[in-house]
Amino acid sequence: VRACTKKSTAALHAENYTPVRDHSKCIGCGECVINCPTGAWTRSKEKYYRLAIMGRTGKKNPRLAEDFLIWADEESIIKIIVNTYKYVEQYIDKNAPGGKEHIGYIVDRTGFEEFKKWALEGVELSDKAIMMNNVYWSGIKYPNV
């Protein structure tokens, strides 16, 4: 419980000397597994991934990436990445400086729904996967920049 609180998201707390996990806070980091003194917590043989999208750095328009999928399997993530390359090839601004454009700008221009349509083409998510219906980017917004 202490390792989760100090090193991660404080998803664990004790009730009657028993660790209880808050699944809404758990990010699957494994600190509980590594630090459990009794070995009661174990990692599943299955691997799951979190896919955060469209974060970018820079002075003009930085923005934090936001979760698109959580608890997705590896096969789904690979298919989504391949599909994302196809999406970029279709929608990249050929007149962008150096022929390069950050994918975040492409998604801004085409809309999240269009990106989602391309990214999920032919992808069957497991029952455990959670997909965000909308993504609202946070971060600093500079006026007139």
Predicted regions and their residues:
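Iron-sulfur cluster-binding cysteine motifs and their immediate structural context
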Residues: 1-21, 31-48
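A broad, structural surface signal
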Residues: 2, 79-89, 101, 113-117
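Extended, compositionally biased low-complexity polar/Lys-Gly-rich tracts
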Residues: 12-15, 19, 49-60, 107-108, ...
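Mobile "lid/hinge" segments at catalytic clefts and subdomain interfaces of large enzymes
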Residues: 35-95
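Flexible, glycine/charged-enriched surface loops at secondary-structure junctions
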Residues: 90-107, 125-134
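Long C-terminal interaction/binding lobes of large macromolecular proteins
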Residues: 113-145
